[in-house]
A protein has these predicted regions:
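Long, contiguous, secondary-structure-rich segments that constitute the structural scaffold
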Residues: 39-41, 45-143
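Long, low-complexity segments enriched in small/aliphatic residues
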Residues: 1-45
Length: 143
């Protein structure tokens, strides 16, 4: 038999996570944003004007943690920490936080030399050898 199984395996990757990460309360999503192609053009002034350093938080989680839109927040896990500005929205489910991928560390106004990638693993996906950002868990707190 050659190739990949045509049936998608939707098993989450918690079994491969370090023990200290499995119990962290938030799943981090870090998709691309339409305002730029990965990080290739982030040096262009009008593209940089778009705030790529937001952390979207569900209203239920934000209320429980005392976080409001515009507050500086800290995401952290055993790999590191990163700072963002909160955006409270129903676009993310409870227990999920969302930041944009490919932020430049040197341009983060909320915490110099921090970005989403400092929280993710170096593990690659089985299909395509891409970064496996979809299985990252973090803490969220007001900074």
């Amino acid at each position: 038999k050659a190739g990949f199984d045509p049936v998608i395996d939707l098993t989450l990757c918690e079994e491969e996570m370090p023990e200290e990460e499995k119990n962290l309360p938030f799943r981090l999503l870090s998709p691309g944003i339409p305002q730029r192609v990965n990080s290739s053009f982030y040096n262009v002034k009008y593209i940089r004007a778009y705030n790529a350093y937001e952390c979207e938080v569900n209203p239920e989680d934000a209320k429980r943690l005392g976080i409001k839109s515009g507050d500086k927040v800290r995401l952290n896990n055993q790999r590191g920490e990163a700072f963002f500005v909160a955006r409270v929205t129903t676009r993310v489910a409870p227990g999920v936080v969302r930041t944009a991928k490919c932020n430049w560390r040197s341009t983060n106004p909320y915490g110099q030399n921090t970005n989403t990638n400092s929280l993710t693993t170096g593990k690659l996906t089985d299909m395509g050898g891409c970064s496996a950002y979809h299985s990252t868990r973090v803490n969220l707190s007001k900074a």
